């Protein structure tokens, strides 16, 4: 191909001339060091190139060579447990080749070309296959079975297929369609800006269980849903994302650290190999793909990292897996868009962000969903996307948050006031919402308990009433309230402190199964019902609040999953204590 020349350099933006043979979104190599870039605008023979590496040292006149291919990712065995940068370069391989610091222009394959994987066919010679059909499996980790699929655009009859140890570029099967024979390897390439095709979208009705009480009970997200976690600095966005990556009942987790601090990725690398998946008992790292594009890496690569991550997520979704993708933080991605837009001298929108911010965000989030994959087998897969948003100063009216809220169905609004009061997760139950509640409620009532939805509604109305009563208390004092209203305040406080608060760093409290959540919630509301019964029988509120059983209700969150029946004993004890109190007419142990 014809070589272009650098005309102008403006930070991560390079303008080259003599590029009439190139296409928009082609990957190019810039300068003598062959820096990786992507064409984002074409005007006659001039190409505006977004360079994914530091451009210091480039000069006008340097060569620009187009590869003729769009920015693509390699999909195949070797993705799980790997850590990539924003353009899918494996960081471990770069370290082995160039040292601790990523040198510019370093070229390494995304997937290891030397490592051999044991391929077990599930189809035989003579079988007819089409795009999306599984022809064999590779046991990638102890918990992930990597399904080798027929690439998009290929169909026909299998001519040869064999079991054995192969690298990702070795031919494992041959498919013949009329006179054309296609060699199938274990690796596929896919352009990151194009969503992977599927049969059809399905209605998401099954919740993604996260083990976080405030999320699962009040603001659930479905498998195949979209959610956002906006919040000011220090409100716990990253810890929420880490908790979801650790405990969500997805089979594959893709974690994108997009423009956040490097220490946060270090935490993931330190914790995930040690933490055990509650379902399989294996380390969490054995189902995780990490994309580290930290704040000290080039800004332009942040835009690519989001697309790289979601393409990998779609690939595992096509295998029929439930995938959870965490993007922390989409605000940094939007800032990268803003910087490139400014360099291109485009007309700015709100706060300098480009006018197309909303459509780019929609392109990303709309790639989530529950789908019926391509192929004759009809596998169901789901890709759930959860994006953190970091609005400056916690201002939720800023453009990135507003663009995100127009697209996603679940809003977990983090509140700095709750965080300052050490209430974590600091999800504000009055501001947050989930539009999946109606879809999920029948599943919860069927699979957890028939009165789940009713309990949730009661608890939510109590918290809402507490907010209204607190306004009265601020104006005229708590003594102006009736005993019934004061009881409501106490029960709402119990809901907040004993149920909604959850310690991410406590070995038991970090995760609560749906059964435990149901019993804990029912216990708090049972306390409300029993104390109301006692109040109606003439017992003083102070006596009810001084009961020792209240401490046991507060400590129920620390009961392990194996000893969950101990919560049932608290129900019986509470009922007995109230009965005794009523029969004596109050004042126990007098």
Curated annotation (Swiss-Prot):
The keyword Isomerase does not apply. Keywords: ATP synthesis, ATP-binding, Hydrogen ion transport, Ion transport, Nucleotide-binding, Translocase, Transport. Its EC number is 7.1.2.2. It catalyses: ATP + H2O + 4 H(+)(in) = ADP + phosphate + 5 H(+)(out). One of its GO terms (cellular component) is proton-transporting ATP synthase complex. Gene3D superfamilies: 2.40.30.20, 2.40.50.100, Bovine Mitochondrial F1-atpase, Atp Synthase Beta Chain, Chain D, domain 3, P-loop containing nucleotide triphosphate hydrolases. GO terms for biological process: proton motive force-driven plasma membrane ATP synthesis. InterPro entries: ATP-synt_VA_C, ATP-synth_a_Xtn, ATP_synth_asu-like_sf, ATPase_a/bsu_AS, ATPase_F1/V1/A1_a/bsu_N, ATPase_F1/V1/A1_a/bsu_N_sf, ATPase_F1/V1/A1_a/bsu_nucl-bd, ATPase_F1/V1_b/a_C. ATP binds at residues 231-238. GO terms for molecular function: ATP binding; proton-transporting ATP synthase activity, rotational mechanism; proton-transporting ATPase activity, rotational mechanism. Belongs to the ATPase alpha/beta chains family. This is V-type ATP synthase alpha chain. It comes from Clostridium botulinum (strain Langeland / NCTC 10281 / Type F).
């Amino acid at each position: 191909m014809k070589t272009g020349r650098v005309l102008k350099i403006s930070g991560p933006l390079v303008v080259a001339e003599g590029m009439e043979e190139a296409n928009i979104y082609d990957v190019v190599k810039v300068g003598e060091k062959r820096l990786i870039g992507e064409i984002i605008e074409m005007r006659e023979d001039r190409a505006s190139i977004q360079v994914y590496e530091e451009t210091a040292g480039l000069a006008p006149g340097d060569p620009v060579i187009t590869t003729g291919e769009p920015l693509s990712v390699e999909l195949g065995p070797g993705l799980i447990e790997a850590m990539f940068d924003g353009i899918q370069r494996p960081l471990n391989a770069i370290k082995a080749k160039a040292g601790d610091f990523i040198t510019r222009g370093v070229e390494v394959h995304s997937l290891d070309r030397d490592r051999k994987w044991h391929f077990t066919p599930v189809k035989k010679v003579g079988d007819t296959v089409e795009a999306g059909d599984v022809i064999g499996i590779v046991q990638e980790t102890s918990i992930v079975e990597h399904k080798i699929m027929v690439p998009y655009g290929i169909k026909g009859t299998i001519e040869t297929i064999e079991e054995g140890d192969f690298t990702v570029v070795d031919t494992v099967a041959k498919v013949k369609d009329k006179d054309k024979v296609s060699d199938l390897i274990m690796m596929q390439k896919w352009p990151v800006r194009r969503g992977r095709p599927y049969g059809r979208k399905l209605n998401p009705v099954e919740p993604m269980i996260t083990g976080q009480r405030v999320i699962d009970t009040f603001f659930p997200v479905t498998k195949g849903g979209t959610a956002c976690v906006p919040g000011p600095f220090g409100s716990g966005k990253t810890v929420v994302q880490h908790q979801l990556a650790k405990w969500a009942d997805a089979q594959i987790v893709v974690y994108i650290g997009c423009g956040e601090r490097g220490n946060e990725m270090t935490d993931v690398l330190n914790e995930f190999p040690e933490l055990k998946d509650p379902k399989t008992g294996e380390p969490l790292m054995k189902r995780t793909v990490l994309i580290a594009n930290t704040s000290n890496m080039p800004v332009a690569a942040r835009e690519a990292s989001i697309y790289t991550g979601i393409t990998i997520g779609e690939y595992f979704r096509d295998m029929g897996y439930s995938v959870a993708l965490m993007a922390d933080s989409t605000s940094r991605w939007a800032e990268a868009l803003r910087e490139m837009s400014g360099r291109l001298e485009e007309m700015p929108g709100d706060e300098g962000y480009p006018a197309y911010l909303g459509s780019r965000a929609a392109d990303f989030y709309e790639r989530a969903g529950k789908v019926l994959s391509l192929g004759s087998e009809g596998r169901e897969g789901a890709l759930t996307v959860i994006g953190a948003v970091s609005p400056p100063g916690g201002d939720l009216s800023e453009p990135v948050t507003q663009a995100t809220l127009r697209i996603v169905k679940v809003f977990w609004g983090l509140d700095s006031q709750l965080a300052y009061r050490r209430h974590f997760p600091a999800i504000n139950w009055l501001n947050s919402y989930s539009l999946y509640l109606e879809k999920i409620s029948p599943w919860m009532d069927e699979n957890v308990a028939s009165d789940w939805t009713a309990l949730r509604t009661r608890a939510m109305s109590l918290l809402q009433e507490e907010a209204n009563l607190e306004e009265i208390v601020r104006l005229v004092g708590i003594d102006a309230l009736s005993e019934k209203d004061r009881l409501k305040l106490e029960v709402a406080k119990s809901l907040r402190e004993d149920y909604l608060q959850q310690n991410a760093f406590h070995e038991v409290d970090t995760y609560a199964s749906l059964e435990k959540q149901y019993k804990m919630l029912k216990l708090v509301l049972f306390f409300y019902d029993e104390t109301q019964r006692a109040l109606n029988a003439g017992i003083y509120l102070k006596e009810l609040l001084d009961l020792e059983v209240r401490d046991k209700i507060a400590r129920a969150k620390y009961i392990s999953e194996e000893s969950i029946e101990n919560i049932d004993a608290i129900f019986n004890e509470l009922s007995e204590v109230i009965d005794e109190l009523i029969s004596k007419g109050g004042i126990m142990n007098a």
